[in-house]
């Protein structure tokens, strides 16, 4: 009775499992939305039931629901309450469930260390599993637990798995070094360094990729570790992971600066014995018009190894290669490579806006140092209306650095389109206006052309205050360079002060300041400008009011100097003492007093303090000091500082640090302590020889010539004659040698079945059954049938005899 009940219960459980599996399959066929709806309807009580289920699919559904709650920061269910139910499933054979439990432990392992220790035993057992993926998962799970008590266990595990036959596991060992170093670098510094040295001597490029990450993160200052691996890393850099390539290039740049001699620049233009000098510390400072660079062979090896990375899809790799050429090569060498083209191509092809802005900043940085690098790609930096604002601003700044006599017409036309078009944001228009000043600085003719276009466009269009401010600032800067040749422009600026009432405070203050600067050249128009400004003094902005005060003081100072000069000349002719300046009778002095009176009661404390300072100077009669302060010539604003916006006037700190020029080491030793070359190849460690089996992937990798293509097509695909012979059957392509030296041969089906021994057939015994009948009629009918049977039996007997004779033979 008990057995029957047990059989019925097991049958019901089996039916339940089959039903749930069928439901899960049906749900998966309905699509992701159906599964999401099912997952969201799992309540807390069902989570406990699913986690305690013996069905791995139900446990997986529960873990997926828990991870989704953790990712969405859903506060409706406290997933930490299921810690014990989750941890006990660590012994499952389902790899996906183990990965989900690993993610759960990352979040909550520190909150309950006692329960976390329950999973340690299972993870340690997985470290000895035959599946390399499970070993890798176990090591990753152990090293990710942020518990100080586990550090010795992890260190012991890392030391054990550093010689694992699987490259994936050894790569995970390198990542575990990073986690241990962050947890307690002072406690395990030497042990981790020894393990890293073993990983750096590995023969597998995948392990080297992970080891480079650990080296860059933990021991980047120990450049001496690269001595025995420098040349090998240069040769295998194309086989590494893209991010590891970037880190390795940065490390090798520092190594070259520290342990390789500085390149020598040889002058080819001089006659007789050629002159030479070390490569300058700053970029593009070589004085020779024609030169060649002599590099150390190891430096040439590193620079040539970068050529295989030109077509890398990772923008960071391209930037790192450009930085290597910027740090270690001459401008001519950098120009002759294809990395400038690759950098421009990466900018145009990438869709990630963060990467594009970073690349544009790098191009702008390099174009400031040497504009000839990017002159062939000027049109690649034209702005499109759909470009983001920051990327558009960087493109315009790059265009401004590329302006010269040969392309100024095209760039000026393009900048005018950005300014006049309504498709571009205001920030882009302002930057385009500021970049026009670079066109005006090429020559006097372009200076007049730019200012004329700006004034005409300003008078014919209704511009916003910020754009109008940019117009005025550009015109003011260009006029200040040569005011005598632009008097007509100056008169128009004077009219703008009264006509354009919407001018921003900064723009109006700039125009007023400009009249104070040209007072020594064209003094006659300045008093009339001051007279107009006094009438609306109280309605002006604080910057404009301050500049009106300074303008009135400057005009009074110039008027006093002109009066003294005229009186000194007249008194010398008449031999009389020069009279004093009449402040009460001078119209300029009266305007100065009016402005001074208004400024003393201004709301801005800066204007009040400045008014008291200026009045004290004039009241003391120290006019020479006043002239020295107010009439001193001001330096012309530099365009490099002017065209950049307030937000992007400098590059980001990351770009500055990335392109920071490293100094060369002058004390270099090429010989080690034993007298050998310090870069002599170190002893490598090949752990693949410990493998006890081989896979189809390894066979195909070692027999790459095996193909279904004909020998006539082999040459078209780059296969040599020997490979084509092996394809056609002449070569020994069916042989394979394992890591431990044992040879195998791939057999065909006929060869495989030919090894099966032939089985001999046994003789069969034939039994004849004869039925008798009492009916005479039936006897007659059966006689004929008996005859037939007799003939058949005789044939069967003869055949059996034949077979028996065959067996006897």
Curated annotation (Swiss-Prot):
HEAT repeats lie at residues 37-76, 112-151, 153-186, 187-224, 524-561. The gene is APL6. Belongs to the adaptor complexes large subunit family. Residues 708-739, 763-809 are annotated as: Disordered. Keywords: Cytoplasmic vesicle, Golgi apparatus, Membrane, Phosphoprotein, Protein transport, Repeat, Transport. Pyrophosphorylated by 5-diphosphoinositol pentakisphosphate (5-IP7). Serine pyrophosphorylation is achieved by Mg(2+)-dependent, but enzyme independent transfer of a beta-phosphate from a inositol pyrophosphate to a pre-phosphorylated serine residue. Present with 3570 molecules/cell in log phase SD medium. Part of the AP-3 complex, an adaptor-related complex which is not clathrin-associated. The complex is associated with the Golgi region as well as more peripheral structures. It facilitates the budding of vesicles from the Golgi membrane and may be directly involved in trafficking to the vacuole. Required for the transport via the ALP pathway, which directs the transport of the cargo proteins PHO8 and VAM3 to the vacuole. This is AP-3 complex subunit beta. InterPro entries: AP_beta, ARM-like, ARM-type_fold, Clathrin/coatomer_adapt-like_N. Its main location: Golgi.
């Amino acid at each position: 009775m008990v057995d029957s009940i047990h059989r019925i219960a097991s049958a019901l459980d089996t039916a339940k499992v089959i039903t749930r599996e069928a439901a899960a399959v049906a749900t998966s066929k309905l699509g992701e939305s159906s599964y999401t709806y099912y997952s969201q309807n799992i309540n807390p009580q069902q989570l406990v039931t699913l986690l305690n289920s013996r069905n791995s699919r139900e446990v997986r559904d529960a873990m997926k629901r828990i991870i989704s709650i953790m990712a969405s920061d859903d506060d409706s269910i406290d997933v930490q309450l299921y810690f014990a139910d989750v941890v006990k499933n660590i012994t499952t054979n389902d790899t996906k469930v183990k990965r989900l439990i690993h993610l759960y432990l990352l979040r909550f392992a520190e909150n309950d260390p006692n329960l976390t220790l329950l999973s340690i035993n299972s993870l340690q057992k997985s470290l000895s599993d035959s599946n390399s993926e499970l070993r890798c998962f176990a090591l990753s799970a152990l090293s990710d637990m942020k518990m100080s008590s586990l550090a010795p266990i992890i260190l012991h595990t890392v030391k054990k798995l550093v010689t694992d036959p699987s490259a994936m596991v050894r790569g995970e060992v390198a990542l575990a070094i990073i986690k241990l170093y962050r947890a307690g670098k002072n406690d395990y510094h030497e042990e981790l360094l020894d393990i890293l040295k073993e990983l750096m001597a590995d023969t597998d490029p995948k392990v080297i990729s992970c080891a480079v990450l650990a080296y860059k993160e933990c021991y980047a200052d120990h450049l001496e570790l690269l001595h025995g691996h420098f040349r090998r890393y240069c040769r295998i850099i194309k086989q590494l992971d893209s991010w590891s390539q970037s880190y390795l290039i940065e490390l090798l740049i520092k190594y070259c600066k520290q342990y390789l001699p500085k390149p020598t620049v040889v002058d080819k233009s001089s006659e007789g014995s050629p002159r030479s000098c070390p490569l300058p510390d700053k970029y593009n400072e070589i004085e020779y018009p024609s030169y060649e660079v002599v590099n150390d062979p190891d430096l040439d090896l590193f620079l040539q190894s970068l050529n295989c990375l030109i077509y890398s899809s990772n923008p960071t790799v391209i930037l790192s290669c450009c930085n290597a050429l910027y740090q270690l090569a001459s401008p001519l060498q950098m120009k002759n490579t294809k990395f400038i083209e690759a950098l421009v191509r990466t900018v145009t092809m990438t869709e990630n806006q963060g990467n594009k802005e970073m690349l544009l900043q790098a191009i702008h940085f390099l174009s400031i140092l040497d504009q000839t690098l990017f002159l062939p790609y000027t049109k690649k930096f034209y702005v499109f209306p759909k470009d983001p604002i920051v990327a558009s601003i960087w493109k315009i700044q790059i265009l401004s650095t590329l302006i010269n006599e040969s392309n100024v017409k095209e760039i000026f036309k393009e900048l005018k389109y950005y300014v006049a078009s309504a498709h571009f944001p205001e920030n882009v228009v302002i930057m385009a206006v500021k970049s026009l000043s670079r066109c005006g600085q090429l020559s006097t003719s372009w200076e007049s052309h730019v200012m004329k276009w700006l004034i005409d466009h300003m008078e014919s269009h209704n511009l916003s205050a910020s754009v109008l401010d940019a117009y005025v600032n550009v015109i003011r800067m260009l006029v200040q360079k040569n005011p005598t040749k632009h008097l007509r422009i100056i008169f128009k600026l004077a009219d703008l002060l009264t006509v354009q009432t919407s001018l921003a405070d900064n723009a109006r203050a700039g125009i007023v300041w400009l009249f104070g600067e040209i007072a020594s050249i064209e003094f006659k128009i300045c008093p009339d400008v001051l007279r107009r400004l006094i009438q609306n003094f109280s309605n002006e902005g604080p910057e404009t009011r301050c500049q009106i005060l300074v303008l009135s003081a400057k005009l009074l100072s110039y008027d006093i100097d002109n009066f003294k000069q005229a009186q000194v000349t007249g008194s010398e002719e008449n031999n009389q003492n020069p009279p004093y300046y009449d402040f009460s009778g001078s119209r300029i002095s009266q305007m100065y007093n009016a402005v001074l009176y208004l400024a003393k009661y201004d709301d801005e404390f800066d204007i009040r303090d400045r008014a008291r300072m200026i009045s004290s100077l004039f009241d003391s009669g120290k006019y020479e000091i006043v002239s020295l302060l107010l009439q001193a010539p001001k330096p012309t604003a530099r365009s490099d500082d002017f065209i950049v916006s307030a937000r992007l006037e400098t590059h980001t700190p990351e770009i500055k640090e990335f392109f920071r020029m490293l100094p060369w080491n002058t004390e270099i030793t090429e010989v080690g302590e034993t007298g050998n070359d310090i870069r002599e190849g170190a002893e490598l460690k090949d752990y693949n020889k410990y493998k006890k089996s081989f896979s189809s992937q390894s066979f195909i990798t070692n027999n790459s010539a095996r193909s279904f293509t004909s020998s006539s097509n082999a040459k078209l695909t780059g296969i040599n004659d020997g490979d084509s012979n092996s394809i056609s059957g002449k070569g020994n392509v069916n042989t394979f040698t394992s890591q431990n030296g044992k040879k195998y041969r791939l057999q065909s089906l006929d060869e495989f079945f030919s090894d099966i021994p032939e089985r001999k057939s046994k003789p069969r015994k034939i039994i004849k059954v004869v039925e008798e009948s009492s009916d005479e009629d039936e006897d007659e009918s059966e006689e004929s049938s008996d005859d037939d049977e007799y003939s058949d039996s005789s044939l069967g007997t003869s055949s059996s005899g034949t077979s028996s004779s065959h067996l006897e033979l």
